[in-house]
Amino acid sequence: MNNTEHFGKLTERMQAFREEVLDAKPYIDAQRAVLATEAYKENQNQPRVMVRALMLQKILEGMSIYIDDKSLIAGNQATKNKNAPIFPEYTMEFVMNELDLFEKRDGDVFYITEETKEQLREIAPFWENNNLRARGEALLPEEVDVFMETGVFGMEGKLNAGDAHLAVNYQRILSDGLKGYEKRVKELRAALDFTDPESIDKNVFYKAVLTVIEAVRDFAQRYSKLAKELADKETDAKRKEELLQMSKICAKVPYEPANSFREAVQSVWFIQLILQIESNGHSLSYGRFDQYMYPYYMKDINEGKITKEDALELLTCLWIKTLTINKVRSQSHTLSSAGSPMYQNVTIGGQTTDKKDAVNELSFVVLQSVAQTRLTQPNLTVRYHANIDKHFFDECIEVMKLGFGMPALNNDEIIIPSFINWGVKEEDAYNYSAIGCVETAVPGKWGYRCTGMSYINFPRVLLCAMNDGVDLTSGKRFTKGYGKFTEMETYEDLLAAWDKTVREMTRYSVIVENAIDKASERDVPDVLCSALTDDCIGRGKTINFPFLQSQKDSSDILCHHLALQQHLRCTALPGASAFSLLNCCRE
């Protein structure tokens, strides 16, 4: 038996749905941008956090919705599958510069109609010098201008887009529903003392949270109504029943708690989707999916409401829907990240907080569903450890043999002690998940970019260290300089120059990050994402603001450490170069 047969095949309709999505031509989609522009214009007197809430509300009320005829789940990001919405509040610069070039790219080609071009031209003037990129650049101190001008720092991802790189608290969303969040916000808002100046800002934030919760509830209700309308016209009895069930589920979740596996899947998808309508930050991840979904799965299995095959088809549908999420990046950005990656990570396996193997029946079903779909999204990560279920780990290896690069493996034996060593509470360390391509974090508790986003061109930094602090590419001085390579007497002299140069460059990159983070705090607060991450509601601040005062487990120290680790991800090439230089010194 080959590996494909080992995991079985997609159902006929999921196979057809998969092919439809894979064959869909990605278009630039202006609808969100137009609605966002209208919301910003209509609410210029409002605090920015309220503008963002009203923007999301307007988008969710006004955007086109549809239900694919082969789908078991409702919810779309754009007017068609795989279309890429435009997020003008971050930047319009590259969009307008490349308006006639999207279809001519070597990679990550996007198609665009003349109507869409005209829509974007109409709204572009409003956003000129009025977005995150403009304000982020305005906050940069002069001392880092040379690094931005020469491109030695790769900061485009943070200037042109949202952040993400997290997993929200899906477990609480399922158990409490947004209704539970709403109740808490109302209680906290009622208890505010407005003689305290901070209460003014908290009140606005709480009002914004209530606005987006209402918007999400109404958005789901739109799908409930649409599913009912489609069911009334449907002639196939089975599909009619599915649409009626979908209508009932969408009328309930995510506002109400989920009580079944189908409700839980739909609730998770709505949140995963809407967070990527609110912001285009990638690496918005599902967290420990097999852990928080397991109670709903087993409840339905034990009560005979669902079979393993039903759950398998539902999950394959979820992963196909996950692939429909898209993002357009600038042409220069695509040179280093082609393939339209969204890095929506699903984590399974690992250990429980009481240090037992966490593999369960749903872990196997998730693994099988990903094996059947064989897609680039979601990214599947398996946490492994010394006592992991052997059969499960063997199955992971069988999936690897399929050759589509999944699952990735995260070693609990390394990651958990590292987290604890840096001050993370033990129970949180044991509950970590993957949040993107390679990063890890505590789901539902860590905020934006706990892993940093400054990409430093280390080969150029090495050459700079060898050239007394002067960049060989631009001829401009980067650092104070620590000698020329031709004048260094030993390999240790080179390493010392390299060490000092890297430290200087890292310091400058932190300055750049701080400026952009500050612009993000002020300009593009994400209200829904904040509400669903602990404990933004408790402190009355958005996720964009630092967590220093509210996190007591030293995880802020960890965040700075991980930011540095992000810098060091690209050191293989200069490391190899240094080794070659060592051989030259020896000769």
Regions found by a protein language model. Give the residues of each.
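Short, conserved catalytic/metal-binding motifs centered on acidic residues
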Residues: 236, 556, 578
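A conserved hydrophobic secondary-structure block that centers on an alpha-helix together
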Residues: 230-241
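Extended non-globular scaffold/tether segments
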Residues: 207-219
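A generic alpha-helix surface/boundary motif
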Residues: 225, 291-295, 576
